[in-house]
Amino acid sequence: YKTFMLLLVATVLLFFDHSVINNFFIQVVNHIGGNSADMGNAIFLAAVLELPTMALFTKFQKKLGCRQMMLISAIFFSVKHIVTYFAMNMFMIYVAQVMQMLAYAVFIPASVYYVSQLVEKHDMNKGQALVTGAMTLAGVFASLAGGVLLDALGVSKVLMIGAIISVLGTICMFVSVEDVDKHERES
């Protein structure tokens, strides 16, 4: 499971900026002149757009394959984080939030399917727990480091650091994700 370990690293890297943005979203929105109502609208937009993607995941996965879905998710996490970094107004934040439908909403079902196809049946629960643990580790690290970095560096620099970390996560994802659909076809 060597590539699976790198997938966990990719997950931590991708979810670090995701968690920083979510945990400190009001600071991000205020930084570009928005307010709590704008933040609520942005969160609502992302949440509403996640639902159809998750509901249609199986259809997309059968057409594109799980590897492609994992890579699409990683790319859109990074695109979302980069757009958030460059956002100058709420419109750009809303554009970034739209990316959620191909980032988080794809990653959650894709990672479950991926683990179920990659690891042996007796390791499946451990595999799922490790992915969830990687997301949780990113959230804890983002909460601790994000607050300190925001105080020390400000919103813009923290978003830049997060976007760079996210791109590194996407690169790790490209290196680590195997074609598990091939495993399914061979069995």
Locations of regions flagged by a protein language model:
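A late C-terminal transmembrane helix in Major Facilitator Superfamily
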Residues: 125-152
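Helix-loop boundary and gating motifs at the non-cytosolic
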Residues: 3-10, 14-42
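Loop-to-transmembrane helix entry/capping segments in MFS-fold secondary transporters
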Residues: 36-37, 119-131
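A membrane-interface helix-boundary motif in multi-pass transporters
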Residues: 148-166
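Structural signature of the two symmetry-related core transmembrane helices
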Residues: 68-83
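Intracellular juxtamembrane helix-capping segments at the cytosolic ends
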Residues: 106-119
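Helix-to-loop junctions at the C-terminal end of transmembrane segments
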Residues: 53-65, 150-151
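Multi-pass alpha-helical transporter architecture, strongest
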Residues: 163-187
